[in-house]
Amino acid sequence: MSPMLATLPDVTAVLHSPSASPPSGLRAPAAVGMGMARTRFLAPRAAASAASAVSAKPAAVAPLYADRTVVRIGLPSKGRMSEQTLSLLKSCQLSVRHLNPRQYTADIPQVPNLEVWFQRPKDIVRKLQSGDLDLGIVGFDIVSEYGQGSDDLVVVHDALEFGHCRLSLAVPKEGIFENINTLEDLANMPEWTQERPLRVVTGFGYLGEKFMRENGFNHVSFLAGDGALESYPAMGMADVIVDLVSSGTTLRENNLKEIDGGVVLESQATLVACRRSLHKRNGVLEITHEMLERLEAHLTATGEIMVTANMRGNSAEEVAERVLSQTSLCGLQGPTISPVYRSRDGKVAVEYYAINVVVPQKSLYKSIQQLRSIGGSGVLVTKLTYIFDEETPRWRKLLSELGL
């Protein structure tokens, strides 16, 4: 808090303290109505007199985008999202060193000058927008809801392969919704009027309202909810819900169903950056590049297997022709084939060729069968940790978006 702003809590304390009556000339705070807070402003003279009563020394206002040398990344502070984030970073040789679990800060020894801050996901997005964080790992649903299309946010990697879910609209299975199976069916129901709008409960007010508006719903009211939204229709508090869905089991167990066209957003974990930081803060672009390369190399290697085998042949070209005739042995850019040297009668001879090819783990057995069918033997299987490309396409895309 800057010195100048230090007077504000004292004024607020005077206004909001239950035991204190408002100073002369000041109005008491207005009550908060459903869904909308109404704010009344203090008259200039009254505000000035209240501030003078507190007496504060004038001080310089700190810049909103304060200079600092350390780069900050925000990570989820708790829950499964936090565990999966730390696990992914560890797999990329970016282990987070968190010495005191009571503290909100940590570091990554492999990346000097990078400071880790554990935050609530929505606070990560807000602090990226303000410039208090430079990078963050957070679900795309949270980025979309709290970022609200802000140009201050740049999605660096949009598919970190965990935290998968969808923001979806669900309706009751019975009653007036029994035959409602599409979004169009729901919009065309005659029940919704200006006097009796469709009542939607959601924790995603921005995305929910935007979705309903873009899909032609004219008579809709929104109720903010947080947790156990599935109970609202059964209790008569709402007609439908817009909530995060993973497997859909919770919806089914509460007699709700998704409808065609009702998916608002597909989401998973993403790496997000503050645009201003990428442009202005020293070290942010370089650290972003390193993290992106590590993440991309590891995620590309996930699910891929290196298969090595020996095969008799008269030449590397002949062996290559046999290997490439098999659909599952094409590799990333093609198989690598090299001679296997043996000593025969005191001379070096080549009778076998070694084949190295990357195949999807899910088709491993099929690949081994195909290798055997063309003469492969001594098959070795190696799990891959990283596959570094010449340059990740996401990095080129980021530079293009930044105009660099």
Curated annotation (Swiss-Prot):
Functional pathway: Amino-acid biosynthesis; L-histidine biosynthesis; L-histidine from 5-phospho-alpha-D-ribose 1-diphosphate: step 1/9
One MF term in the entry's GO annotations: ATP phosphoribosyltransferase activity
Localisation: Plastid, Chloroplast
Example of a GO biological process term: L-histidine biosynthetic process
Bridged cysteine pairs (disulfide): none
CDD domains (alphabetical): PBP2_HisGL3 (cd13593)
Regulation: Feedback inhibited by histidine.
Name of this chain's protein: ATP phosphoribosyltransferase, chloroplastic
Taxonomic placement: Eukaryota, Viridiplantae, Streptophyta, Embryophyta, Tracheophyta
